[in-house]
From Swiss-Prot:
Record protein name field: Cell adhesion molecule 2
Record-linked CDD domains: IgI_2_Necl-3, IgV_1_Necl-3
Species assigned in the record: Rattus norvegicus (Rat)
S-S bonds: 44-104, 146-203, 248-296
UniProt gene name: Cadm2
GO biological process: one example: synaptic membrane adhesion
Alphabetical list of Pfam families matching this protein: C2-set_2 (PF08205), Ig_3 (PF13927), V-set (PF07686)
Family from the record: Belongs to the nectin family.
């Protein structure tokens, strides 16, 4: 009797110790998120374990691994690490059906468990843009739709035009047939103009399964529009005798056909001097009869457009032509004559026969050179006249011939010199003789 009572006490003591030790053992797990087709790692850890077994089971409560022993025949499930403190397994090529709550069990008294939820992300398919039919006419309303399927959770769609995001769009989300993924679509409405031609409209799909590389679809717009026309002259102030080139700059889609040039609403009056080469109108030897309104017309399959240029031919500037001056050393007065010719005073007949290259050599530097030469000649002439006058003034006075020197009343040489240079007292007695 005593022996039986002692055995019972020992049994309860051992059970109490086991129960007390198991209270400090807890399995630890973490939730896992993986992209569809990826590999999930499920880890269960126990900090204090007295050689108690660990087990992983799937959402259907099927045992996957018991310690290091594989229980379910699934080639996708592999053992990563097995010890008394850790049991880790991997599930490769994860599908949406693998999502759910997995259980790690620690076989103590009682059994302790920890849950880990496996989240599988559905990767959205490459988006597709629909609704564009080329070409689109300028001013039309365009509607583009971007669509993607297979995302879980639902993906986000964003629109960009010229690298600028468009906010005002419509968004629609629908659940797929498997009731796990979503189909998302977005519609963009806008009115196009010629500036949209060649512009890329981008639909971008953002989703957490794509990391930093979003999926995109691009649509390049093709817009047809009427031509725009502008006339560019080769010189801003055309003059008589010059040549003038008018360039008709036209832009349109389709590209405009060869342009049409007219003057004052009619054909060009002088085809010999007014030559059309492509988009250019070349007018040779301008004259006043060329004045008028020139019109350039450009046409494509969408429409027609034109531009006008009013031509005013200016007169040739006045030209100064000085005459050559020959200096003279005589006492006669010197007269300087400058001849000025003006083109407006010439007759109509002479202007019509004028050589357009006759004024090519008369420019600013030649006029300055001629003016400088004239100034030097005038200065030398004036200096010569002044010196000649001084010379004549100094040699003016009384001079005696040889016959006069023998007369009784003839003054001596010294007196004659003095009278020639000094002041004269009696003007009536002086006589002038020239040798």
């Amino acid at each position: 009797m005593i022996w039986k009572r002692s055995a019972v006490l020992r049994f309860y003591s051992v059970c109490g110790l086991l129960l007390l030790g198991s209270q400090g053992q807890f399995p630890l797990t973490q939730n896992v998120t993986v992209v569809e087709g990826g590999t999930a790692i499920l880890t269960c850890r126990v900090d204090q374990n007295d050689n108690t077994s660990l087990q992983w089971s799937n959402p259907a409560q099927q045992t996957l691994y018991f310690d290091d022993k594989k229980a379910l025949r699934d080639n996708r499930i592999e053992l990563v690490r097995a010890s008394w403190h850790e049991l880790s397994i991997s599930v490769s090529d994860v599908s949406l059906s693998d999502e759910g709550q997995y259980t790690c069990s620690l076989f103590t008294m009682p059994v302790k468990t920890s849950k880990a939820y496996l989240t599988v992300l559905g990767v959205p398919e490459k988006p597709q843009i629909s609704g564009f039919s080329s070409p689109v006419m300028e001013g039309d309303l365009m509607q583009l739709t971007c669509k993607t399927s297979g995302s879980k959770p639902a993906a986000d769609i964003r629109w960009f035009k010229n690298d600028k995001e468009i906010k005002d769009v419509k968004y629609l989300k629908e659940e797929d047939a498997n009731r796990k993924t979503f189909t998302v679509s977005s519609t963009l409405d806008f009115r196009v103009d010629r500036s949209d031609d060649g512009v890329a409209v981008i639909c971008r799909v953002d989703h957490e399964s794509l990391n930093a590389t979003p999926q995109v679809a691009m649509q390049v717009l093709e817009i047809h529009y009427t031509p725009s026309v502008k006339i560019i002259p080769s010189t801003p102030f055309p003059q008589e005798g010059q040549a003038l080139t008018l360039t008709c700059e036209s832009k349109g889609k389709p590209l405009p056909e060869p342009v049409l040039w007219t003057k004052d609403g009619a054909e060009l009056p002088d085809p010999d001097r007014m030559v059309v080469s492509g988009r250019e109108l070349n007018i040779l030897f301008l004259n006043k009869t060329d004045n008028g309104t020139y019109r350039c017309e450009a046409t494509n399959t969408i429409g027609q457009s034109s531009a006008e240029y009013v031509l005013i031919v200016h007169d040739v500037p006045n030209t100064l032509l000085p005459t050559t001056i020959i200096p003279s050393l005589t006492t006669a007065p010197v007269t300087t004559t400058v001849a000025i010719t003006t083109s407006p005073s010439t007759s109509a007949s002479s202007s019509s026969r004028r050589d357009p290259n006759s004024l090519a050599g008369q420019n600013g530097p030649d006029h300055a050179l001629i003016g400088g030469i004239v100034a030097v000649v005038v200065f030398v002439t004036l200096c010569s006249i002044f010196l000649l006058g001084r010379y004549l003034a100094r040699h003016k006075g009384t001079y005696l011939t040889n016959e006069a020197k023998g007369a009784e009343d003839a003054p001596d040489a010294d007196t004659a010199i003095i009278n020639a240079e000094g002041s004269q007292v009696n003007a009536e007695e002086k006589k002038e003789y020239f040798i």
